[in-house]
């Protein structure tokens, strides 16, 4: 078996959903989509096609997920066309850069790591146009 995408959904924990939403909207220039259930409050990242793309959200789960700057998986968010364009907005939006733009290789692009407003360690990745 092979996957088009190894990940189908991700959740970034938030203790202040409004603050987290403003942060991600500011650095990516997007409008997040509210999706609340009885147990979760979510703000989804916009997605063209749920069947072929990777979806995700910032989530207030009432403590089921907890923000962490050191533990757990590291999620890489799409920062195309250039990681630096997103990094340039991180400080003003309330985040902190902990790994600056770093080239992985010419063919695999660049990455960086930040701490978001909720205390999560989040990575960015961009791939050069081929």
Kindly label every feature range from the protein language model.
Residues 7-15, 64-91, 110-115:
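Vicinal oxygen chelate
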Residues 20-24, 90, 119:
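Conserved active-site tyrosine of GNAT-family acetyltransferases
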Residues 38-42, 105-110:
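Short acidic/glycine-enriched loop/turn segments that link adjacent beta-strands
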Residues 2, 11-54:
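Core segments of cupin and vicinal oxygen chelate
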Residues 45-50, 114-117, 127:
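Active-site beta-strand termini and strand-to-loop segments that position acidic
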Residues 1-21, 73-75, 125-130:
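N-terminal beta-strand motif that seeds the catalytic metal site of vicinal oxygen chelate
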């Amino acid at each position: 078996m092979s996957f088009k995408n190894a990940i189908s959904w991700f959740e970034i924990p938030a203790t202040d959903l409004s603050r987290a939403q403003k942060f991600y909207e500011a650095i990516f220039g997007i409008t997040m989509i509210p999706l609340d259930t009885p147990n979760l409050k979510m703000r989804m990242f916009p997605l063209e096609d749920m069947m072929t793309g990777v979806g995700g959200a910032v989530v207030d789960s009432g403590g089921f997920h907890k923000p962490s700057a050191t533990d757990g998986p590291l999620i890489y968010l799409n920062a195309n066309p250039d990681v630096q364009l997103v990094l340039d907005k991180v400080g003003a939006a309330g985040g902190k850069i902990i790994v600056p733009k770093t080239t992985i290789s010419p063919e695999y692009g660049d990455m960086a790591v930040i701490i978001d407003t909720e205390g999560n360690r989040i990575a960015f990745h961009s791939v050069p146009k081929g």
